[in-house]
């Protein structure tokens, strides 16, 4: 498989695919009770190979076009519905999208480090999500990265306090 190739699909919504994070060979598919998929093991090869999805002009896409691109790239399955945390379906139009860039849990990623060098890509992603529904970005009062504090096309909300201050 290549990075971005579909590893499996949502059985209730087959157009929602889940993409491989690495290129290599699928070595195991582990299932639990009632054949619940627990894990797909991909042995990474030496050099990453990427599936091509082509490029597009974001300004020419509407919300449905963004959904189509997310489906094609295998990324749509990572959008969850609240309050139950289940994958959403492409036919559902959300009232709002919440992006959490707030570090309040121990051992969680530092968004200042994670975004370094990827600010333009991050903004493109936020702009794409905002075409689907009103988008909110939650950040920490301590964050100084301009990609977070001055994000465009979203409503930025600043949180402060210990876990679970910014639960989404």
Question: Language model features by range: what are they?
Answer:
Residues 1-4, 13-28:
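Generic structural motif
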Residues 10-21, 35-39, 50:
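Short, Lys/Arg- and Gly-enriched loop/turn segments at beta-strand edges
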Residues 30-168:
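Buried, small/hydrophobic-residue-enriched core segments of structured protein domains
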């Amino acid at each position: 498989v290549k990075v971005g190739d579909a590893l499996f699909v949502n059985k209730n919504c087959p157009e929602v695919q889940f993409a491989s994070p690495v290129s290599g060979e699928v070595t195991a598919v582990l299932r639990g009770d009632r054949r619940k998929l627990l894990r797909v093991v991909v042995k990474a090869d030496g050099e990453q190979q990427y599936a091509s999805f082509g490029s597009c002009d974001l300004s020419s896409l509407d919300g449905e076009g963004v959904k189509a691109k997310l489906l094609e790239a295998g990324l749509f399955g990572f959008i969850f519905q609240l309050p139950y945390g289940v994958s959403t379906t492409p036919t559902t139009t959300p009232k709002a999208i919440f992006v959490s860039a707030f570090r309040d849990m121990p051992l969680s990623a530092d968004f200042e480090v994670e975004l370094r060098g990827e600010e333009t890509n991050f903004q493109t992603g936020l702009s794409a999500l905002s075409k689907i529904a009103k988008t909110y970005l939650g950040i920490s009062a301590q964050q100084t990265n301009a990609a977070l504090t001055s994000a465009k096309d979203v409503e930025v909300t600043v949180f402060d306090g210990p876990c679970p201050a910014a639960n989404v």
